[in-house]
Amino acid sequence: MSDASPNSGGGIERVANRLVRAGGLERVAIGVASGMTALLIGLVIVAATGHSPVLFLREMFSGIFGSERGIALSLRESTVFILCGVAVAVAFRAGIFNIGVHGQFVFGGLATVMTILALAPSLPENTIGGWTLIVLGTVVGVVVGGLYAALPGALKAYADANEIITTIMLNFIALGIGLYLLSGPFQGEGIQEPRTESLPDYAAFPDLLFSIGSFSLVGFAIALAVVLLTYVLLTRTRIGYDMVTSGKQESAARYSGVPADRTIVGTMTLSGMIAGLAGAVFAIMVLGGFVDPRGINTYGFDAIAVSLLAANNPLGVVPAGMLFGGLERGGSFIGITTDIPSQLVDGVVGLVVLFVAVPELFRVGAARWYDHGDEK
């Protein structure tokens, strides 16, 4: 191991020190500059493959801002990215790597749909009945997501199991169980592919401002409310203090009497509850039921980059999630309206994501290195 200290004068150390000390505006500027650089490189690649970079750029922005539908679909994607990003950020702030958000998302959405379909026959087919179904289904989805995340949390706290390994394994288990349920016990009647029946029309979020059936401002408002509540929890409560202290300086948390085991399980449970809520909103607002989980976008994995870009700050997750939502929508639109290969579009979008996320990832790693250096 190198004897270099955090205060050594090497080039890498100077860059790390600059990133760690960067203020909020500087970090935003770094992110914007990185994104613009990546986009420029991507456009050069597009031109080198014989396609028009001007067309690429025009269709990208047209897909995001060019119509009411484009804006609505961008906000729809952003809603899910924000919720999943907050779920990841909660765990990461506590120094816990919850890589299982996608599995918790799937189980939360599936549990929500199963609950609504099971209770629908016993409730009136009106607005009151619809909102009752939405609330009850969402509560069940949140609880299921939380319990599914509590399992690897308990394994880490009481059996010293690596949460990265256990959460990744639980992702595959969630996909497998979900596919089994949708191919058998809960497959919709008369439906060939693995999916549930559609939710009742009255058990849906109302259209507000936008007339796009798969998006409602109610879902976006839920995401913003979760962001604010999570921020207050982490910065203004004893529970949040215990979580953040455990993540930043484990030894300091231990000396101050923070119950490490309970904090780990509680943090994972909260993270999973938010992931379950994301799945519930996605199932109600976007799918109107539930489909083969293998075909669902990997929001839980992409949310890791969203959280890193936001420096694991719930407030920062909002612009980061909206960036990812816009890129997702713009990339899809380009694939539909041009002959540019989808692989090339995905590559350029991935390049932007990589360039934007890496500086923040490096900053977080450098900050931890400095903290460990101070402890020594």
Predicted segments with their positions:
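Transmembrane helix-bundle core of multi-pass membrane transporters
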Residues: 163, 167-232
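Cytosolic-side transmembrane-helix boundaries in multi-pass membrane proteins
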Residues: 1-35, 248, 255-262, 331-376
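Alpha-helical transmembrane segments within multi-pass membrane transporters and channels
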Residues: 124-165, 169
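Helix-loop-helix "hairpin" substructures at the membrane interface of multi-pass membrane proteins
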Residues: 215-288
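Membrane-interfacial amphipathic/re-entrant helices at transmembrane-helix boundaries
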Residues: 2-85
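Single transmembrane alpha-helix segments in multi-pass membrane proteins
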Residues: 44-49, 62-119, 138, 154-160, ...
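Transmembrane alpha-helical segments in multi-pass inner-membrane proteins
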Residues: 275, 279, 286-350
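Hydrophobic alpha-helical segments embedded in the membrane of multi-pass proteins
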Residues: 78-89, 104-107, 147, 169-172, ...
